[in-house]
């Protein structure tokens, strides 16, 4: 056991040789390195697998005998100051290492095929390896200085990966947006680290917590000052984990390749923000105002992320807002003091969301066979539909991930989300009502994505791409604002379906299946397909393994008997655990209470699924569905008012709550206006004074010269 801990310092450095060797190869042997580029995936996966095995061994040691191991080296700068750096291994480090390495391995396997035709293949694997190194270094850091250094490396790698296709203006803007947004909170984090050192004189976690707590209990430091210090430390996690109001970078981060999106949303970037809070929880827990702030930010993010996901057309942006909402659940649990539930949901959500993102990548990959490389089309759910029969394996995997996200038993997210929802009643009834209601919204937007993508007919074959309507009288339009003969425009839920307001829908006959499909050949592809096609095996394999994780990872929190003592693997792994809502950590709630809460949560999720099915199932598959819509449209005289309300909600959701617009007007344009004003003042006033003095001196001198001459 001691051997395992002694060599734990190598964890962050194992993947590091890959980017170094790729860089040296491109510098010294550029042609050979590029020609043999596919060989770099194997060592990348191999080295990360070694770290995974090491992490599993550490976790087994933690289960058998929970302990904290810290080793530091002292670097004495002078007699008054010495800096210590080292590594810190506890249960949080071991479980997060397993999470990051497993998801990272699956993403690397997937990306080998996904990025095989991209000219930036080598750059992709170099960045990914550096990303994993940075995240593993963040986990094993023993003090706040090391945390900050690896924190910045994680931010830098996310900047490089989000802007991977930097020649596209959208990707360049997205990576700049992520960088600037995170710099705001990173500045707050750096201030808080300095303030914490000024108060305690220590950077090491254990010394910092002990001194900080003693100062507060003995009233030796001003309470407002320590509250400000803790707030600045928490601010670092707000942007990194996409919490309100600094969540705006997360949807735009979808401009990067899909494997990058999977890694950022499941195991690295956003997980770093969540990781920081439990790492510093012994410091936050003695300041009730900070815990209340954390829970408040969490519940706002939960609701905002779910509502903004309801109307997104881009499949990856919809999943991005889903991630934002689920991160809000984790932050809510941490603010409530439910340490175990928060980390459990981080684990289950990571595997489920990685599965969904890799599934969306498979969908995009199949759509590109028809529309070519065009993210506006290949990622747009308006052009999808009916993919179930074309990509059946992807459909099954995506359905499993969707059901898990909805909280359907026995899938992974059911166990963790149900625990958070149950604890929320003990903390605040208002927060509980919002959290439970959002669980229904989660099921609704998740199944909306599934239904629009896999059910119905492939809409891509019933439209052309020039923004002009096809000559066929059978064009399928799920979105439309103008009246047609077969659908009552006054149906009160119709505005919710409006996504393309400039095009008229066409009437559908009963012989839709007789329509000739269109082969598209004008998007730069030498070979075109009439139908989307399933991805290659190297892309399907990691998805199927993630399906197994999604099915069975929830079992680590199921309690069982061992010699008359109730315990579960997760509690053993997270010992010592902090839970303010359950002071007796060994007493588990009885099965009756569990079944009651589970039945209620599943009922809410089922209602959300039913709502999505009612609104987004393939309406045009039969005339009965159309008659059903018209029957709904005849209800009551208030339907026009309800239509307006629903349309306003939809418009607000589709436009991201106008938060990005507000930031663009108030901050971006304001700063540019200030810069232009400063430039004008500098050129016209400062330079004008200088030039005016010189010109005046010149003419005065010339005048004196003339008079004197």
Curated annotation (Swiss-Prot):
Organism of derivation: Pachira aquatica
Protein task: NDH shuttles electrons from NAD(P)H:plastoquinone, via FMN and iron-sulfur (Fe-S) centers, to quinones in the photosynthetic chain and possibly in a chloroplast respiratory chain. The immediate electron acceptor for the enzyme in this species is believed to be plastoquinone. Couples the redox reaction to proton translocation, and thus conserves the redox energy in a proton gradient.
Topology in the lipid bilayer: Multi-pass membrane protein
Keyword Transmembrane helix: yes
Keywords noted in UniProt: Chloroplast, Membrane, NAD, NADP, Plastid, Plastoquinone, Quinone, Thylakoid, Translocase, Transmembrane, Transmembrane helix, Transport
NCBIfam families to which the protein is assigned, alphabetical: NDH_I_L
A GO molecular-function descriptor: NADH dehydrogenase (ubiquinone) activity
Keyword NAD annotated: yes
Protein name, entry field: NAD(P)H-quinone oxidoreductase subunit 5, chloroplastic
An example Gene Ontology CC term for this record: chloroplast thylakoid membrane
């Amino acid at each position: 056991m001691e051997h395992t801990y002694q060599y734990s310092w190598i964890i962050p450095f194992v993947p590091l040789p890959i980017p170094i060797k790729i860089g040296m190869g491109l510098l010294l042997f550029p042609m050979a390195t590029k020609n043999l580029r596919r060989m770099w995936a194997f060592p990348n996966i191999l080295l990360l697998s070694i770290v995974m095995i090491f992490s599993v061994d550490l976790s087994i040691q933690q289960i058998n005998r929970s302990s904290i191991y810290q080793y530091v080296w002292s670097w004495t700068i002078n007699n008054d100051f010495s800096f210590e750096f080292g590594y810190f291994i506890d249960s949080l480090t071991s479980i997060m290492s397993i999470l990051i390495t497993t998801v990272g391995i699956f993403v690397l396997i997937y990306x080998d095929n996904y990025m095989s035709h991209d000219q930036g293949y080598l750059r992709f694997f170099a960045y990914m390896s550096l990303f994993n190194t940075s995240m593993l270094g963040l986990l094993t850091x023993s003090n706040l200085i090391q945390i900050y250094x690896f924190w910045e490396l994680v931010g830098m790698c996310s900047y490089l990966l989000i802007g991977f296709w930097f020649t596209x203006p959208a990707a360049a803007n997205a990576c700049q947006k992520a960088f600037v947004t995170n710099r705001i909170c990173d500045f707050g984090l750096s201030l808080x680290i300095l303030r914490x050192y000024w108060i305690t004189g220590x950077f090491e976690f254990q010394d910092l917590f002990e001194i900080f707590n003693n100062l507060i209990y003995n009233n030796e430091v001003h309470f407002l000052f320590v509250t400000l210090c803790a707030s600045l430390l928490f601010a670092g996690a707000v942007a990194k984990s996409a919490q309100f109001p600094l969540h705006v970078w997360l949807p735009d981060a979808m401009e990067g390749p899909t494997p990058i999106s999977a890694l950022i949303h499941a195991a690295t970037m956003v997980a770093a923000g969540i990781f920081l809070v439990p790492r510093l929880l012994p410091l936050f827990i003695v300041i009730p105002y900070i815990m209340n702030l954390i829970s408040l930010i969490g519940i706002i993010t939960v609701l905002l992320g779910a509502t903004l996901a309801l109307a997104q057309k881009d499949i990856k942006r919809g999943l991005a807002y889903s991630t934002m909402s689920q991160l809000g659940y984790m932050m809510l649990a941490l603010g409530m003091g439910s340490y175990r539930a928060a980390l459990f949901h981080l684990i289950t959500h990571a595997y489920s969301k990685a599965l969904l993102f890799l599934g969306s990548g498979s969908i995009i990959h199949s759509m590109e066979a028809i529309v070519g490389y065009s993210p506006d089309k290949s990622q747009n759910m308006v052009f999808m539909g009916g993919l179930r029969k074309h990509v059946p394996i992807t459909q099954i995997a995506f359905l499993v991930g969707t059901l898990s996200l909805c909280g359907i038993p026995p899938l992974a997210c059911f166990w963790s989300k149900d625990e958070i929802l149950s604890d929320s009643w003990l903390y605040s009834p208002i927060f509980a009502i919002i959290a439970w209601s959002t669980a229904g919204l989660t099921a609704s937007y998740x199944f909306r994505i599934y239904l629009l993508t896999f059910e119905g007919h492939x809409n891509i074959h019933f439209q052309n791409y020039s923004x002009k309507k096809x000559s066929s009288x059978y064009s399928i339009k799920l979105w439309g604002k103008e009246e047609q003969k077969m659908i009552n425009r006054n149906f009160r839920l119709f505005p919710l379906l409006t996504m393309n307001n400039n095009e008229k829908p066409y009437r559908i006959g009963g012989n839709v299946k007789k329509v000739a499909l269109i082969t598209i050949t004008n998007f730069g592809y030498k070979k075109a397909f009439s139908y989307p096609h399933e991805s290659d095996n190297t892309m399907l394999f990691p998805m199927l393994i993630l399906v197994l994780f999604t099915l069975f990872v929830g079992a680590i929190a199921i309690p069982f008997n061992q010699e008359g003592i109730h315990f579960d693997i997760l509690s053993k792994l997270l010992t010592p655990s902090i839970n303010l809502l359950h002071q007796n950590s060994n007493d588990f709630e009885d099965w009756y209470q569990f079944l009651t809460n589970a039945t209620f949560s599943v009922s809410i999720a089922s209602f959300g699924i039913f709502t999505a099915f009612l609104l987004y199932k393939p309406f045009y598959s039969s005339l009965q569905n159309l008659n059903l819509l018209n029957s709904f449209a005849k209800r009551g005289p208030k339907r026009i008012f309800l239509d307006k309300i629903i349309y306003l909600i939809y418009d607000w959701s589709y436009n991201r709550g106008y938060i990005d617009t507000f930031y663009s007007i108030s901050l971006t344009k304001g700063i540019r206006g200030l810069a232009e004003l400063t430039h004008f003042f500098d050129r016209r006033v400062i330079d004008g004074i200088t030039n005016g003095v010189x010109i005046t001196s010149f003419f005065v001198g010339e005048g004196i010269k003339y008079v004197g001459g």
